Swiss-Prot record:
This is NADH-quinone oxidoreductase subunit K. NDH-1 shuttles electrons from NADH, via FMN and iron-sulfur (Fe-S) centers, to quinones in the respiratory chain. The immediate electron acceptor for the enzyme in this species is believed to be ubiquinone. Couples the redox reaction to proton translocation (for every two electrons transferred, four hydrogen ions are translocated across the cytoplasmic membrane), and thus conserves the redox energy in a proton gradient. The lineage of its organism: Bacteria, Pseudomonadati, Spirochaetota, Spirochaetia, Leptospirales. One of its GO terms (cellular component) is NADH dehydrogenase complex. It comes from Leptospira interrogans serogroup Icterohaemorrhagiae serovar Lai (strain 56601). One of its GO terms (biological process) is ATP synthesis coupled electron transport. The gene is nuoK. PANTHER family: NADH DEHYDROGENASE SUBUNIT 4L-RELATED (PTHR11434:SF21), NADH-UBIQUINONE OXIDOREDUCTASE SUBUNIT ND4L (PTHR11434). Coiled coil: none annotated. It is a multi-pass membrane protein.
Amino acid sequence: MNHFISGIPIHYYLILAMIIFTIGVAGVMVRRSAVLIFMSVELILNSVNLVFVTFSKALHQIDGEVVVFFVMAIAAAEAAIGLAIVIAIHRIKKTSYVDEMNLMKW
C-alpha cells in the first residue's frame, strides 16, 4: 500500500476527513435551521467521500471513486428534495427552524 498521495501522507487526509465529519455532526446536533442542518449533512457526506477517494488512490482501485460519484448524485437529489420541502414548510409556517415545524401535530 502506498502511504503517500501526491507527496502527502494518507493519515493527513483521514485526519482532515475526521475533522470535517465532526464539524458536520456538531452542526446537525446544534443547529436549529433546517438549511444549516442540510449543509451539515453535506459536510458529513463530503468527509465520507474524502475517505473513499483516499483509500481508492492508496490502493490503486477505482471502486472508491465510483462510489463517490453515486454518493454525490444521491446527495444532490437529497439536497434538492429537502430544500423543496423546507421551502414549502417555510411558506406555510413562516419559519425554517426545525423546533417549530410541527405539521404532523393536531
